[in-house]
Amino acid sequence: MGFITKAIPIVLAALSTVNGAKILEAGPHAETIPNKYIVVMKREVSDEAFSAHTTWLSQNLNRRVMRRSGSSKAMAGMQDKYSLGGIFRAYSGEFDDAMIKDISSHDDVDYIEPDFVVRTSTNGTNLTRQDNVPSWGLARVSSKKAGGTTYYYDSSAGKGVTAYVIDTGIDINHEDFRGRAKWGKNFVDDMDEDCNGHGTHVAGTVGGTKYGLAKGVSLVAVKVLDCEGSGSNSGVIKGMEWAMREASGGGNGTAKAAGKAVMNMSLGGPRSQASNQAAKAISDAGIFMAVAAGNENMDAQHSSPASEPSVCTVAASTEDDGKADFSNYGQLVDVYAPGKDITSLKPGGSTDTLSGTSMASPHVCGLGAYLIGLGKQGGPGLCDTIKEMAHDAIQRPGEGTTSKLIYNGSGK
């Protein structure tokens, strides 16, 4: 069950400071990627200064290659650059210790963070009704009482809203999507398909015709995790950057365009300042983001992007309104949503039943799309709307944790 494979939550600590730039150290249980780092620039650094820095970096690396002895391994250097909303500029790549020391001494650098493995988070009026729902979560979202079998929803059903699913990809040809899913971008391998199944399951809960909350939403696959359900933090951030630009009209859009978009991240890893900063940039751009709280049965403050306050962090509930035993908790959890034994789509035209905060988060993403379709204001403030609509239902939610369970306002 999810976060489907566990990610070990840790807190990054400052390893050293050289001329003000922190080199962060991952905790002892993080699956760090050897010699891979994310370098984050100071917020005030301009595009021109960022370009000058990367030019300096390339020149420095070239000099090192020329001086390198035949026995030492050549590092790949900078591999990706990031710019989210003009407030988060960074790059990632492969660097040796000497190069990292040089980078850390550069005045424009804010901090350097080791790259690590990130994994899936799987352990009204005019109402339409869907009877005998295939997954209990649908009925629970539209009723203030547990045990129902009907999903009540407005026929607008999220039409005109686009949901970006940052995950393992989506089987866009699954019949339950009825042509509303499309491929976006792949940041992890050369297979534009969901070879894991996690992303298709998540997308089905967001917007499947039979299995989804927002049955009219458009879905976009942003693949950042591989067939095993894992990927690098740097690759995930690259996917976040792409989705943000697309949601904002290719980087030249308006807040209105962004307000018609939602994102889901049913994944996570150790607490990451870079990941949280990227998530905040997306929220600041006026885009609603639902994020899985994590499945370690501990405080969500230790996981990213769940620990970023500007996103909507979702814990998992059971069919009898309890806290799922695996679900993370804590003050950073915004709401609970159904997350145990959730049936949704599986690549190849079939279905699967999975558990995890990975399954809870898309209920909130789908609800967000549904509410925008009804005319509610999008963006990060939508999480406050969802919390206001939610009702106290969760028994023993965890220390310092809300007992609010999501509700779509059907009146049932």
From Swiss-Prot:
Domain Peptidase S8: 135-412
GO cellular component annotations of the record: extracellular region
Residues making up the propeptide: 21-126
Keyword presence, Secreted: yes
Annotated Inhibitor I9 domain residues: 36-120
Record-annotated active site: D167, H198, S358
EC category: hydrolase
Gene Ontology terms, MF aspect: serine-type endopeptidase activity
Annotated compartments: Secreted
SUPFAM superfamilies documented for this protein: Protease propeptides/inhibitors, Subtilisin-like
Keyword annotations: Glycoprotein, Hydrolase, Protease, Secreted, Serine protease, Signal, Virulence, Zymogen
Residues in the signal sequence: 1-20
Swiss-Prot/TrEMBL GO biological process terms: proteolysis
Positions of glycan attachment: N123, N126, N252, N264, N408
EC number: 3.4.21.-
PROSITE patterns recorded: SUBTILASE, SUBTILASE_ASP, SUBTILASE_HIS, SUBTILASE_SER
Family named by the database record: Belongs to the peptidase S8 family.
PANTHER family cross-referenced by the UniProt entry: CEREVISIN-RELATED, PEPTIDASE S8
Known function: Secreted subtilisin-like serine protease with keratinolytic activity that contributes to pathogenicity.
Name of this chain's protein: Subtilisin-like protease 6
Origin species: Trichophyton equinum
Encoding gene, per UniProt annotation: SUB6
